[in-house]
Structure formats: C-alpha cells, structure tokens
Amino acid sequence: GIMKGEKNEMKKTLDEMTLEELWMLFPILLKEYNPLYPVWYEEEARKILATVGDVFRVSHIGSTAVEGLLSKPTVDILLELTPRADAEKAARALKGEWTLMSESEDPWKLSFNKGYTPDGFAEKVFHLHVRRAGDWDELYFRDYLRENPSVAAKYALLKRELKEKFERNRDGYTAAKTDFIKEMTARARLCYGTRYRPKLRP
C-alpha cells in the first residue's frame, strides 16, 4: 500500500479542485443548533477587532445567530468598516488567518472563510463578510427570525426540503432560499424601521 506520507503529497489543494470536487468535499450539511456558536463567534470577533482597524461594527449573522435554528454549521460574521477605512488594508490584515473566497469588482464586498481543509470541514467553520458600514439586510433578517419562532420554524422546513434537492449544489441551494429571505427581510424592515442604519458623522 501507499505510505501515509506519500498519500498526502498526492492530495490536491483546494485551489486545484474543480467546483464539483469542492461540492463533494463540502456538501450541504444541516445540523441542529449548537449552543457554542455564539461563543465561537465571540472568540473570532475579538481576534478580528485586534487585527483590523477602523471597524464600525461586528455582528453574528446567518442561521447560527438564531438560537434553536437548524443550519449549516458555519458561523457567519459581518464586519463593517468605517467610511474612512481602507478595504485592501483590512484584507491584507485578515489574509494570515482567513482565506479569501470571492473578490467582487467592489473592494468593499469581500468574503473570507476559515475551516475548509483538503480533508473536508474543520470542527469550526466561519464565513466572514467584509463591507462598508451600512443598513444591511442580514441584520434585519436575523432579528426577525429571532423574534418570530414560527418564521424560523418555516425557514428550517424550507432548508430541509432544499437540502434534499441541492445537496451537492451549494449555489442552487442558496439561490432557492432567496425569495423567502427577501420576503422576510421586507417584513422585518417594516417592523424595525432603520434599526441598523449607521449614524455616522461624515
């Protein structure tokens, strides 16, 4: 047989894998709520605040921020920087600990991850969304689910259905949730007004 050391050398890095290979390695997992999610978030938030300057707000978003909600075991973090911040400088500061997932044309919309390894998911998996301080939908959606357990239950049901359909197609899974998220976010904004609009001096 192949010795263990040799086997590892043959293993592809994530960069070398096709999208299909990545989806096989990182299928959509839905897990019951883990009470450690907020703790993991706090640990990472502290590290981020110690690493990046000009931070306006750090928030725990996504389903792991809603107690009791079925979710992919990925802690989503929204990092909002002040208007005077330098997005590229922030990205450089994060690159030691985090892997850049997507760069859009807009340097202010960066996604990073942590916990994706060539062997699959690590115990703790994070997505970090870096943006300019703003009135972001994700904060409203999160609060609406937290404050309306029946809506959260409906969302969990939808996720279970979609997981059956899109287990190996992360993009399809995400797109199929969009209508529900949009509708609930619109309701949340009606309820909450401008709860998260930054009150920034120019």
Annotate each PLM feature.
Residues 5-59, 182:
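Helical scaffold of the NTase/Pol beta-like nucleotidyltransferase catalytic core
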Residues 20-25, 68-72, 120:
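Short, flexible turn/loop "capping" segments at secondary-structure junctions
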Residues 47-77, 81-85:
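Active-site nucleotide-donor binding segment shared across nucleotidyl transfer reactions
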Residues 56, 70-74, 89, 107, ...:
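Short connector loops at helix/strand junctions that flank enzyme active sites
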Residues 89-97:
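Short amphipathic alpha-helices in soluble, non-transmembrane regions
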Residues 98-133:
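Conserved catalytic core of two-metal-ion nucleotidyltransferases
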Residues 132-202:
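Catalytic cores of NTP-dependent nucleotidyl/adenyl transfer enzymes across multiple folds
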